[in-house]
């Protein structure tokens, strides 16, 4: 009986160490920002998802691997996941609001310098945070990130188009004709492996790219601040890893 109890206690402790935790804080403008925590050992890393506007759970494969050796914080950026906005407009999606959110997370985690792991837009947001709050970052890790300025958009589209097949282009035109978002059509162009692209496409919600969605509003403001960001980034002296 004692052995059974010990086994049960061990399993219970193991589950609690590896289970998901959900918490939140209120940002400067009163928006409640949620985050999830996976794993409990090792260094703390903050995962910043792409979009802007994608539900962060598409990074599940990544944090399920990392949680074995790290404490992973999955931030639900404003307007995504559980971090709902009362109003989605240009004011609520300014880059400075995202920076306020990361400052709130920084305080919530005890004021320890952050290790930011940014995918796509998440990397672009990491640049913005480093430009404005360089002393609060320990390290930046970029996963298929966009650039520091909006100049990368000029070749970004070409890289996507060269991977598209006739069937993708047909769907692209159909989406335009039906006034639907085109990302569902060009999604395979973001991947080296088409099979993986097609496998990940169905669960995604592409409404975030609609005219009044998170994507055009947040990325639009980010593009406006390119010169300012480049100038301020000179103050960040920490390491940046590119993957």
Q: Can you say where each PLM-predicted feature lies in the sequence?
A:
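Alpha/beta-hydrolase
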Residues: 173-231, 238
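Short beta-strand/loop motif that positions the catalytic acidic residue
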Residues: 236, 242-243
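Bacterial Sec-dependent N-terminal signal peptides
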Residues: 1-22, 241
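Flexible "cap/lid" loop of the alpha/beta hydrolase fold
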Residues: 140-174
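Conserved HGGG/HGGXW glycine-rich cap/lid loop of the alpha/beta-hydrolase fold
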Residues: 27-85
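Active-site loop/oxyanion-hole signature of alpha/beta-hydrolase fold enzymes
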Residues: 77-121
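Conserved hydrolase catalytic core segment
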Residues: 112-154
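Active-site acidic short loop of glycosyltransferases
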Residues: 40-42, 68, 107-112, 135, ...
């Amino acid at each position: 009986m004692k052995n059974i109890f010990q086994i049960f206690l061990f399993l219970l402790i193991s589950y609690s160490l590896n289970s998901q935790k959900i918490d939140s804080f209120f940002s400067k403008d009163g928006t409640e920002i949620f985050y999830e925590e996976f794993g409990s050992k090792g260094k703390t890393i903050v995962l910043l998802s792409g979009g802007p506007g994608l539900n962060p759970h598409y990074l599940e494969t990544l944090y399920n691997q990392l949680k074995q050796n790290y404490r992973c914080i999955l931030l639900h950026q404003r307007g995504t996941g559980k971090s709902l906005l009362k109003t989605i407009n240009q004011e609520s999606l300014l880059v400075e609001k995202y920076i306020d959110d990361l400052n709130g997370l920084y305080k919530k985690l005890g004021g320890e310098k952050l290790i930011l792991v940014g995918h796509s837009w998440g990397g672009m947001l990491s640049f913005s945070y480093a430009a404005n709050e360089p002393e609060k970052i320990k390290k930046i890790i970029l996963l298929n990130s966009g650039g520091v300025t909006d100049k990368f958009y000029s070749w970004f589209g070409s890289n996507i188009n060269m991977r598209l097949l006739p069937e993708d282009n047909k769907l692209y035109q159909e989406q335009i004709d039906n006034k639907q978002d085109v990302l569902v059509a060009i999604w395979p162009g973001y991947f080296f492996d088409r099979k993986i692209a097609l496998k990940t496409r169905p669960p995604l919600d592409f409404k975030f790219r609609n005219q009044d969605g998170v994507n055009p509003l947040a990325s639009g403001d980010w593009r406006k601040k390119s010169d300012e960001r480049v100038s301020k980034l000179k103050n960040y002296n920490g390491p940046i890893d590119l993957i």
